[in-house]
């Protein structure tokens, strides 16, 4: 029996503005986000004794601590695999709090991903990954399979072949996200919704992906404060309890290129995450009132819905077409606009939106939301959360 479910909660969220050129260092972005989250929780930097971030983050825990007035650290950790780390940072923070290792842990991610190193350029546009991953890329890069969009296009084309999905089916994900972003003043695409025709007319990046199937490249930072549920109840905001937190890596897992499995149209690592989340929380898909699904590329939203039990394999296209991801639908999704509409902060801004949904303060609040399921990056070893109200 896990000691984790309900033992810890997210009590504070904070972010910088989301832009295309922040004009400041990644360390400054990290510190601004961390301080904003601490203030939102009604705490002081001196209360913090733990920090968690991504292995990809350039702002080390000790430098964030030094520059924010945080003192001694009893817990510090990093989670790997790019966007797959997002919910994993909260899992590690919650485990530290639940076991008494630390009392106040801040999770953060900050980068200049548009004005600095652009992930969209893939391995051709930045220093190549080292170690064993470089050997795996040797089977891809020399043949021109260099960028995340290209890697996902391979998956998307096979999914279309197997289940009859179309570019329009992918486009409906983008339309919903941009609709939600259009009413979110913090979103980059605030007041700029799109139509399915706009999606279809946007230029090809790599078939079958149009430009509007691809997430943004953003500058910004996001942070979250995790404390015990008991302590969170005495802080300013209604706590978002962590009812489930899990990581998952599937059989024959690769980084965005798991093409060697017997069946490549699913994302079994997300299925593994979902199984753990439901088991920990005692919930099932019908109990989930809203979702934040990692949307770096629209095609990968469809198999997430299937792996997590919201619809059967191959039926996500119909689930979406029926309006289920809309504010008034069965599963309001990415109410902040997602990474397509608000910003690409490796999924951390999505966790913050889940907290707002539990608090009842989202700009696109779909009524009372008791439980929110959040996912991290897909195509890589990944993670997920179920956040909910105090029971």
From Swiss-Prot:
Give the EC number: 4.1.3.-
Sorted alphabetically, which InterPro entries does this protein's record hold? Thiolase, Thiolase-like, Thiolase_C_2, Thiolase_N
GO BP annotations of the record are: bile acid catabolic process; lipid catabolic process
The record's catalysed reaction(s) read: 17-hydroxy-3-oxochol-4-en-22-oyl-CoA = androst-4-ene-3,17-dione + propanoyl-CoA
The active site annotation covers: 294, 344
> What are the alphabetically sorted keywords of the record?
Bile acid catabolism, Lipid degradation, Lipid metabolism, Lyase, Steroid metabolism
According to the record's subunit comment, the protein's assembly and interactions are: Homodimer. Interacts with the ChsH1/ChsH2 hydratase via the DUF35 C-terminal region of ChsH2 (ChsH2-DUF35).
Q: Which PANTHER family match?
A: ACETYL-COA C-ACETYLTRANSFERASE, NON-SPECIFIC LIPID-TRANSFER PROTEIN-LIKE 2
**Protein name per UniProt:** Steroid side-chain-cleaving aldolase
Q: Which gene encodes it?
A: ltp2
């Amino acid at each position: 029996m896990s000691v984790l479910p309900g033992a810890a909660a997210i009590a504070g969220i904070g972010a910088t503005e989301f832009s295309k050129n922040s004009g400041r260092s990644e360390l400054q972005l990290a510190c601004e986000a961390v301080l904003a989250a601490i203030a939102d929780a009604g705490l002081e930097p001196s209360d913090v004794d733990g920090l968690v971030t991504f292995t990809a983050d350039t702002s080390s825990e000790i430098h964030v601590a030094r520059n924010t007035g945080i003192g001694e650290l009893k817990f510090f950790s990093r989670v790997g695999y790019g966007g797959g780390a997002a919910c994993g940072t909260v899992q590690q923070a919650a485990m530290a709090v639940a076991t008494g290792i630390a009392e106040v842990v801040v999770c953060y991610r900050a980068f200049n991903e548009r004005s600095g190193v652009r992930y969209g350029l893939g391995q051709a546009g930045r220093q190549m990954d080292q170690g064993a991953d470089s050997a795996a890329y040797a089977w891809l890069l020399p043949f021109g399979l260099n960028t995340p969009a290209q890697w996902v296009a391979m998956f998307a084309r096979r999914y279309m072949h197997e289940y009859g999905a179309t570019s329009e089916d992918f486009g409906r994900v983008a339309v919903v996200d941009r609709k939600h972003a259009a009413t979110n003043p913090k979103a980059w695409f605030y007041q700029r919704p799109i139509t399915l025709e706009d999606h279809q007319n946007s230029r090809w990046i790599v078939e079958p992906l149009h430009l509007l199937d691809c997430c943004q490249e953003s500058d910004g930072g996001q942070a979250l404060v995790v404390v015990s549920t008991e302590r969170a109840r005495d802080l300013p905001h209604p706590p978002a309890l962590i009812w489930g937190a899990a990581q998952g890596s599937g059989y024959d897992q690769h980084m965005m290129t798991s093409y060697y499995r017997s069946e490549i149209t699913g994302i079994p690592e997300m299925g593994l995450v979902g199984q753990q989340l439901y088991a920990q929380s005692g919930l099932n898909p019908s109990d989930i009132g809203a979702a934040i699904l990692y949307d770096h590329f629209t095609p990968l939203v469809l198999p997430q819905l299937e792996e997590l039990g919201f619809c059967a394999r191959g039926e996500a296209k119909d689930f979406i077409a029926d309006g289920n991801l809309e504010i008034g639908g069965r599963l309001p999704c990415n109410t902040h606009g997602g990474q397509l509409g608000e910003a690409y902060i490796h999924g951390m801004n999505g966790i913050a939106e889940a907290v707002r949904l539990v608090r009842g303060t989202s700009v696109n609040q779909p009524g009372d939301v008791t439980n929110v399921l959040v996912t991290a990056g897909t195509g890589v070893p990944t993670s997920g959360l179920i956040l909910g109200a105090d029971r």
